[in-house]
Design a protein with these regions (language model features):
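Short pre-catalytic strand/loop immediately N-terminal to key active-site residues, enriched for Gly-Thr
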Residues: 10-15, 192-205
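Acidic-glycine-rich active-site phosphate/pyrophosphate-binding loop
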Residues: 1-2, 8, 19, 179-194
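Charged C-terminal helix
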Residues: 53, 226-256
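Conserved N-terminal subdomain of the carbohydrate kinase-like
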Residues: 2-8, 20-109
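Conserved phosphate/ATP/ADP-binding segment of small-molecule kinases
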Residues: 116-191
């Protein structure tokens, strides 16, 4: 490993189960030097769990501060607005050859308002510039523009997202297709790989962030994509098994 510096473009989860806390914990456990450009803050208010986007000028200043840093990999998480996303996209366009993992987090993903639609279109613009995308089932439905109710639907959506420009796709199905097992579908443009694990009951906040940052970490360390996904699946499974009320536990997962 020639370069152990890895960047997260992600938000701050106030409870530290996900977001930049999960990213940095995962980077540290992999022996990497983690950097963060913060995309948003979060807080639990009388209105529920709220997201407060980073001012676009400040976000750009963060990225400008990192221009001279040579990164071995980048993980992209919550991009709360089109404006923030555009600045992130311009940043990775200048990093050709660097592995990039895009976790296309869609806030309020159960709604289909104009803001979500615009953000979907902006995230699709990232696809040709990343290594792999890691949507969950609702995010894959929004990005692919289709309902997913069966394993074949997951495969169709993965192919559609690949056709939109993503070199590789892993759709995290969770337990929506089956009550007793979690099903994920990986597609690299040629072959499908199906992952199945028993469902763990409990808090899984931060699992998606941890999964994406673990994949990015393995790629920085020189692993090929499919083995990176396989080892990251195992790591996240252990992290969910050790979760508390605030989310998955990366450090405890690494001890098992």
């Amino acid at each position: 490993m020639k370069n152990n510096r890895i960047l997260a473009l992600s938000g701050n989860d106030i409870f530290s189960g996900g977001g930049l806390a999960a990213d940095l914990a995962t980077y540290t456990l992999n022996g990497l030097h983690g950097f963060v450009a913060m995309t948003c803050l979060t807080a639990l208010t009388e209105n529920g769990f709220e997201v407060f986007p980073t001012d676009e000028t400040i976000f750009q200043q963060q990225l400008d501060s990192l221009k001279s840093v040579d990164f071995g990999g980048i993980k992209i998480g919550l991009l709360p607005t089109v404006g923030v996303a555009e600045k992130a996209l311009n940043f990775i366009k200048e990093r050709t050859g660097v592995p990039v993992v895009l976790d296309p987090v869609l806030v309020c993903k159960e709604t289909h308002d104009v803001a979500v639609s615009e953000l979907c279109q902006e995230l699709i613009r990232f696809f040709p510039y990343v290594t792999v995308i890691t949507p969950n089932l609702p995010e894959a439905e929004l990005l692919a523009g289709q309902k997913i109710e069966t394993l074949d639907d997951m495969k169709d959506a993965a192919q559609k997202l690949h056709d939109l420009g993503a070199p590789a796709v892993i759709i995290k199905g969770g337990n929506r297709l089956s009550q007793d097992k979690a099903v994920d579908v990986f597609y690299d443009g040629e072959n499908f790989t199906i992952f199945e694990n028993p469902v763990i009951q409990g808090q899984n906040a931060g699992a998606g962030c941890t999964f994406a940052s673990s994949i990015a970490s393995q790629l920085v360390k020189g692993e090929e994509l499919l083995p990176a996904i396989e080892s990251s699946k195992a790591f996240v499974y252990r992290a969910i098994a050790q979760a508390d009320q605030y989310g998955v536990r990366q450090y405890e997962a690494n001890q098992n």
